[in-house]
Design a protein with these regions (language model features):
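Short, Lys/Arg- and Gly-enriched loop/turn segments at beta-strand edges
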Residues: 34-42, 62-63
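Structural preference for beta-strand elements that scaffold enzyme active sites
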Residues: 146-148, 184-186, 217-219, 263-265, ...
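Flexible glycine/acidic-rich beta-alpha junction loops that bind and position SAM and/or redox cofactors
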Residues: 159, 194-195, 215-240, 258-282, ...
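Conserved Radical SAM active-site core
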Residues: 61, 68-214, 224-251
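Radical SAM enzyme core and accessory elements
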Residues: 1, 7, 275-446
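Short, compositionally biased
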Residues: 40-54, 69-71
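Conserved PDZ fold ligand-binding element
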Residues: 17-37
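Short, structured beta-strand/loop micro-motifs enriched in basic residues and often containing a Trp
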Residues: 4-13, 33-36
Length: 446
């Protein structure tokens, strides 16, 4: 473990961090004598009211004493959430998205993490194949819950093959052990036709249902293949998607009868592949896997339903743009076209919907989250775009700043010669059209 601690990147005025004497550039080494390896340790050991912070400032090591109010926020930000580095993935899944990336994309995309701390902090999925006994002791002490686990299959030999061939622990025993520690799990199964579909998928769901005291949800996600993946892998077809939904519906009915939750949650993409409508809001049980593409479309439709009623009641809704272009990936294109037509009717402005194909990963990749800046420039560069173009928020990183191929929003605005905004919902679109400060980026932005 690194002894360098966490680099302080920001200190909020009037916060505990400022009161304790922390400064930007300090390194927090320990709290009450406990070395800190990450922000998880900071939260855990920093939960006491009386704290002694061991800090490196330049060449000096200082002890800072301060009292922290009950539930008072630290008010100090760290340069990175993990102070001792990210634990990388040692598996070799044939469908691994990162392994199939071409060169020239945003550097952070090539990090193949498999770190349970990031799973706890940000909901990233982990395989649990690299847990050591020291990790289990920490999990027992700190109760890091929930964790997000890539199961793929519960049958040990099949899971071993799906993860690349090396021996792996029995995921059923690992989940059972997590449950005994009071840690809950949100699981995902990436469906790879010919491997873990059919009877294998049925067995996986059955095994996870038997562990339902620990497993809170199971997302079913179709394998995402690009032109850079091995040819032996097959995509989920509409027919298979329908079969998966039929099986999932049966389990969802059983789970609701016995546990008052649906337990199994097919992703939006599976519904779209099968040509079926996504189910109602209540069936998502609070949207536990929305970041995994489960329920985004339902949220979109619900938001527009509410917003449409509001706009129709307020026919004088103020918008500053008379013409707008809405951009989408292929999968969401029918819904964005519907939105464009209804917005135009209600607001009395020109609204154009443009579907952007994926040139980098191939036309079979239909989600907006994998569109690149280059895709946008090639699809939009020769078109009349109106006063503002609204892009899918999922095209950009967590900070909303960069595309997969490292284009920024100001760079795209300058290249396309028009004002740009991003939106994750119909409400965001109306906000961008309102002309509010900061809602969009002009073409002459720095």
């Amino acid at each position: 473990m690194s002894t360098e601690g966490g680099l302080i990147a920001s200190v909020a005025a009037g916060s505990f961090a400022e009161r304790a004497g922390l400064r930007c550039g300090d390194r927090l080494l320990a709290i009450n004598g406990h070395p800190v390896r990450d922000v998880v340790d900071v939260r855990f050991y920093g939960s006491e009211e009386e704290l002694v912070l061991t800090v490196r400032r330049g060449a000096a090591v200082l002890s800072l004493r301060a009292s922290r109010g009950y539930c008072e926020d630290w008010g100090g930000g760290f340069a990175e959430p993990l102070f001792d580095g990210v634990r990388s993935c040692a598996n070799h899944c044939p469908f691994c998205f990162v392994a199939g990336l071409p060169a020239g994309l945003r550097p952070s995309l090539y990090v193949r993490d498999d770190d349970y701390r990031l799973s706890f902090l940000s909901g990233s999925f982990v395989t649990l194949t690299n847990l050591e006994e020291s990790d289990w002791k920490r999990l027992a002490e700190q109760r890091l819950s929930p964790l997000y686990v890539s199961v793929q299959a519960t049958e040990p030999d099949l899971r071993r093959r799906l993860l690349g061939g090396a021996p792996v622990p029995d995921i059923r025993e690992q989940i059972r052990r997590l449950g005994e520690l009071g840690i809950t799990v949100h699981a995902q199964v990436v469906i790879c036709p010919g491997f873990n579909d059919g009877a294998a998928l049925e067995q996986t769901v059955s095994d996870l249902w038997a562990l339902r005291s620990a497993v809170r949800s199971v997302a079913l996600v179709p394998v995402g293949l690009t032109r850079h993946h091995p040819a032996r892998l097959r995509r989920v077809t509409p027919g298979l998607a329908w079969e998966v939904l039929t099986m999932a519906d049966r389990w969802r009915r059983l789970a609701y009868r016995e546990a008052r939750r649906r337990f199994v949650y097919p992703s939006d993409e599976i519904y779209l592949l099968a040509g079926r409508q996504v189910p109602g809001t209540a069936t998502y049980d609070g949207f536990p896997q929305i970041a995994n593409g489960v329920g985004l479309l339902r949220r979109f439709l619900d938001d527009w339903s509410r917003l449409r009623r509001h706009l129709m009641q307020r026919s004088g809704q103020h918008v500053t743009a008379g013409s707008v272009t809405l951009v989408s990936g292929t999968a969401m294109s029918p819904y964005v076209r519907m939105l464009a037509q209804e917005l135009a009717q209600i607001l009395g402005i020109s609204v154009t919907a443009i579907e952007v194909p994926n040139c980098l990963f191939g036309p079979e990749v239909t989600v907006a989250g994998l569109l690149t800046g280059r895709d946008l420039v090639e699809a939009l560069g020769h078109r009349e775009l109106g006063e503002i173009v609204i892009l899918p928020r999922t095209m950009f990183d967590a900070a909303g700043e960069r595309t997969l191929d490292d284009w920024t929003l100001p760079e795209l605005a300058r290249t396309l010669g028009t004002r740009l905004a991003t939106a994750a919902s119909p409400s965001d679109i109306i906000h961008a059209l309102s002309g509010a400060d900061g809602a969009s980026v002009p073409p002459d932005s720095a």
